């Protein structure tokens, strides 16, 4: 562990973006401003602000936010004393026009996110962000679903489009430290030395901190976390804990250990609609390696067909389903109900 003594990392805050998921994208401008100012004062260098599903995420499918991306970004950016602001963009949801808008409002970092086997859809957005001279990140989601060799190919594609940092993203909170090490080591070795490596964790198996430290050991210099863990599932890596652990290990974050605790406790916990914890549902997501948005579909299917949502989620994980295949959840539930003799004869 002493090998990390004196190493510096950039802690990237997710409270105001991934944290939009448990808030159903309904954070107020005042909540955004207050939390962002607290994070800024605590020394957090980079803060992500958008709809939970990124720029342009406002839709029937993903949820309508309380305010537009422009309003959220416009409220936060002028107040920042030292922190820079980032925005997430998923090709197919966010467009080049959203990217331009973000740049004009003063967004410093753009993170272009794709499924971990689909980096090729990011070329237009990554190359355009680089043209705008933005800090440009390629963000490979659900990374447990690709092999280290497969992730290397995808990471190199994003790097070739112009990304100056590549993220390995554990969207389901499925990975264990050894999974993180084998993937990040391979990607770190394959990228140019000047290309940064990042890690985004979820706490569904309580591995957020351990995985983040494993990532730092493999050369990651950017680590995502959220105050009080506010994020999808059991939340993101809790920032106040990560900062304290890094401090104990001699890893420099530039974030004040006490101030970030106060932001989490005094500003973030009071706005939670429900406790962010490892409940049965979040644990199943992590155990089965399933994307968080499948949960409600699985619960609906349970009511309709009598197959427990937990069993269905495990099966979806086994089949390697990814975001966008929500229609297959119904099909899988129907098949399982048939196999278990839960359907009336005429339906079978």
Curated annotation (Swiss-Prot):
Bilayer-crossing regions: none
Residues carrying the site annotation Transition state stabilizer: 17
Binding annotation for Mn(2+): 18, 200, 202
Domain Pyruvate carboxyltransferase: 9-261
Keywords for this protein: Aromatic hydrocarbons catabolism, Lyase, Manganese, Metal-binding
MF (Gene Ontology): 2-isopropylmalate synthase activity; 4-hydroxy-2-oxovalerate aldolase activity; manganese ion binding
Catalytic activity: (S)-4-hydroxy-2-oxopentanoate = acetaldehyde + pyruvate
InterPro entries: 2-IPM_HCS-like, 4OH_2_O-val_aldolase, Aldolase_TIM, DmpG_comm, DRE_TIM_HOA, PYR_CT
Binding sites annotated in the UniProt record for substrate: 17-18, 171, 200, 291
Catalytic residues in the record: 21 (proton acceptor)
NCBIfam families membership: 4OH_2_O_val_ald, PRK08195.1
UniProt similarity note: Belongs to the 4-hydroxy-2-oxovalerate aldolase family.
Protein name: 4-hydroxy-2-oxovalerate aldolase
Record organism: Ralstonia pickettii (strain 12J)
Lineage: Bacteria, Pseudomonadati, Pseudomonadota, Betaproteobacteria, Burkholderiales
């Amino acid at each position: 562990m002493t090998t990390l003594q004196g190493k510096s990392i950039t802690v990237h805050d997710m409270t105001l973006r991934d944290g939009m998921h448990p808030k159903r994208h309904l954070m107020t401008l005042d909540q955004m401003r207050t939390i962002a100012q607290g994070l800024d004062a605590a020394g957090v260098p980079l803060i992500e602000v958008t709809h939970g599903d990124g720029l342009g995420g406002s839709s029937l499918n993903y949820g309508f936010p309380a305010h537009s991306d422009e309003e959220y970004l416009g409220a936060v950016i002028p107040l920042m004393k030292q922190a820079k602001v980032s925005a997430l963009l998923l090709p197919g949801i966010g467009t080049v026009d959203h990217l331009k808008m973000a740049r004009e409002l003063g967004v410093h970092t753009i993170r272009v996110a794709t499924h971990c086997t689909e980096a090729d859809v990011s070329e237009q957005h990554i190359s355009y962000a680089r043209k705008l001279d933005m800090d440009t990140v390629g963000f490979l989601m659900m990374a447990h679903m690709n092999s280290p060799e497969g992730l290397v190919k995808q990471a190199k594609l994003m790097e070739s489009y112009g990304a100056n940092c590549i993220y390995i993203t554990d969207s389901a909170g499925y990975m264990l430290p050894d999974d993180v090490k084998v993937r990040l080591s391979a990607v770190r070795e394959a990228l140019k030395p000047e290309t940064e490596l990042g890690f985004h964790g979820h706490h569904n198996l309580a591995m957020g901190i351990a995985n983040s430290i494993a990532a730092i050991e493999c050369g990651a210099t950017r680590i995502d976390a959220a105050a009080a863990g506010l994020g999808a599932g059991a939340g993101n890596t809790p920032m106040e804990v990560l900062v304290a652990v890094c401090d104990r290990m001699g890893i420099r974050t530039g974030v004040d250990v006490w101030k970030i605790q106060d932001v989490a406790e005094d500003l973030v916990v009071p706005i939670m609609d429900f406790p962010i914890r490892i409940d049965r549902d979040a644990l199943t997501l992590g155990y089965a390696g399933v994307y968080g948005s499948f949960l409600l579909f699985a619960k609906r299917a349970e009511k309709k067909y009598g197959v427990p949502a937990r069993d269905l989620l495990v099966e979806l994980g086994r089949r390697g389903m990814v975001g966008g295949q929500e229609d297959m959840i119904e099909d899988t539930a129907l098949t399982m109900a048939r196999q278990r003799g839960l359907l009336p004869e005429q339906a079978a």
